[in-house]
């Protein structure tokens, strides 16, 4: 199993294997989820002070805020041209040798 990483903006990278959902932060239920995660200490703000455009929910119940559009994150997830994935696979092959 190869590890696939996704760039969520400003040099921040997350594991695609842990991703559950990518949603827009506009709705009231998502705003509540963000606030609850903040209160529990499970919120990761990767916006660098910019406007939150995507909320990423992980299987570990962490909530990650990103300044990148949800569509962009999804496209990066579906892309077969991920440089990071290729790099990790090459590293794994070198370790096996």
Curated annotation (Swiss-Prot):
It holds the Pfam family RemA-like. HAMAP family: RemA. Belongs to the RemA family. NCBIfam families: MtxBflmRegRemA, PRK04323.1. This is Putative regulatory protein Teth39_1325. It comes from Thermoanaerobacter pseudethanolicus (strain ATCC 33223 / 39E) (Clostridium thermohydrosulfuricum).
């Amino acid at each position: 199993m190869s590890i696939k990483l996704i760039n969520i903006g400003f040099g921040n990278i997350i594991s695609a294997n842990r991703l559950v959902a990518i949603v827009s932060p506009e709705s009231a239920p998502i705003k509540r989820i963000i606030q609850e995660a903040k209160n529990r200490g499970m919120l990761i703000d990767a916006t660098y002070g910019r406007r939150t455009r995507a909320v990423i929910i992980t299987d570990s119940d962490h909530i990650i805020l990103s300044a990148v559009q949800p569509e962009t994150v999804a496209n990066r997830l579906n892309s077969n041209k991920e440089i990071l994935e290729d790099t990790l696979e090459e590293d794994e092959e070198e370790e096996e040798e």
